[in-house]
Amino acid sequence: MKIGCDLVSIARIEKIYQKHGEKFLDKFLDTDEQKLFKTSSSLAGLWAAKEAASKALGVGISLECSFFDIKISKDSKNAPKLDFSQKILKNFKVQTASLSISHDFGFAMAVVIVG
């Protein structure tokens, strides 16, 4: 098992979104993921989740793992769910993945465990 985590300032993500709008969203979220964006906190949580997932793989966001190789959705209980592209599943031999996202005191944090 490997663990990745990321902590991001919600204000920082909000500022980037205000400056770049949809272009910022299109850079790291697919159309389904963009529907999860309701507030600056949720947007920062999505950013942190993708960063944490890439760190759990040991490569960060890179040619080996792009933002679009990581898919965030919600499960039947509305908890965040993490899926990887077939490329990632094969190259990193991922069998399981767990994601937790939290927001508090102006920060969003995500923790990912892959096995």
Give the ranges of each region predicted by the language model.
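Core catalytic alpha/beta fold that binds nucleotide/phospho-ligands
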Residues: 1-115
